[in-house]
Regions:
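Pre-Walker A-like glycine/lysine-rich segment at the N-terminus of P-loop NTPase domains
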Residues: 1-46
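Short hydrophobic/aromatic segments of transmembrane alpha-helices and their interfaces
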Residues: 3, 43-44, 114-117, 184-185
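Generic alpha-helix structural propensity
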Residues: 24, 35, 39, 56, ...
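ABC transporter nucleotide-binding domains
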Residues: 25, 43, 112-114, 136
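Short amphipathic alpha-helical segments enriched in hydrophobics
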Residues: 44, 48-52, 166
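Nucleotide-state sensing region of NTPase/ATPase domains
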Residues: 49-126, 130-132, 141-144, 148, ...
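An accessory alpha-helical subdomain
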Residues: 121-212
Length: 214
């Protein structure tokens, strides 16, 4: 069982230095427009994913006129107390630690604090293209399966290399099909793992959705 007991924000978005305590299992956040309700939720997202829900650029989350941010959360995970701290240094370097133990790779943290975001643009999962649905599914499976995330990282990196190679074919006229074959072969292992895990999840999940829909 996971529970967030408190969170402290330093120079995060519109917060100069502010702390919030969450004493109940269910918490409602209310306030006038512009006071920072969504920013508070985004700070919680930061503790779960080490990034903002809204932007990939960490600098966009720094309070205007300042440098660096610090987000600290006090958690209870399976009856044990944990302190999670995310720091963006003045140099732009980002650090994340749980109980003062820093991660070598941020991907090691994903799934430790499961997080579900419900937002108006979720309608895109139904009305939008398949890319939005794949992204949603990937985010969910990465929290459930660390190995899935590692395969996904490798797969995306190879796809980038493959696309760059195809672009060079067009720009230079030099067609290195041997290298293209190597990249295609490297895609097989992570691609099969990703496909199988997506299929496995959907076989389990779709009957539940159909039952709720009916």
């Amino acid at each position: 069982m996971l529970q967030l007991h408190s969170i402290s924000l330093l120079q995060f978005k519109n917060y100069t230095n502010r702390s919030f305590d969450f004493t109940n299992r269910i918490v409602g956040i209310c306030g006038n427009n512009g006071v920072g309700k969504t920013n508070l939720l985004d700070a919680i997202h930061y503790l779960c994913f080490i990034k903002s829900y809204f932007t990939r650029q960490d600098a966009n989350n720094v309070l205007h006129g300042n440098v660096g941010i610090r987000v600290e959360g006090n958690m209870e995970l399976f009856d044990k107390q944990e302190k999670a701290v995310c720091i963006l240094r003045e140099t732009g370097k980002k650090e994340f630690a749980v109980n003062d133990n820093q991660y070598d790779k941020f991907s090691q943290h994903i799934g430790r604090y499961p997080c579900v975001v419900i937002a108006p643009d979720d309608a895109e999962l139904i009305t939008g293209d398949s890319k939005a649905r794949r992204t949603f599914l990937d985010l969910l499976l990465c929290q459930l399966d660390g190995e899935y995330m590692q395969h996904l990282i490798v797969y995306k990196k190879i796809i980038e290399q493959r696309n760059s190679l195809l672009k060079s074919f067009f720009e230079t006229g030099n067609r290195n099909f041997a290298l293209l074959d190597v990249l295609d072969e490297q895609l097989v292992k992570p691609g099969i793992y990703i496909f199988d895990k997506r299929k496995e999840f959907l076989i389990f999940y779709l009957p539940l959705v159909k039952n709720l829909y009916n």
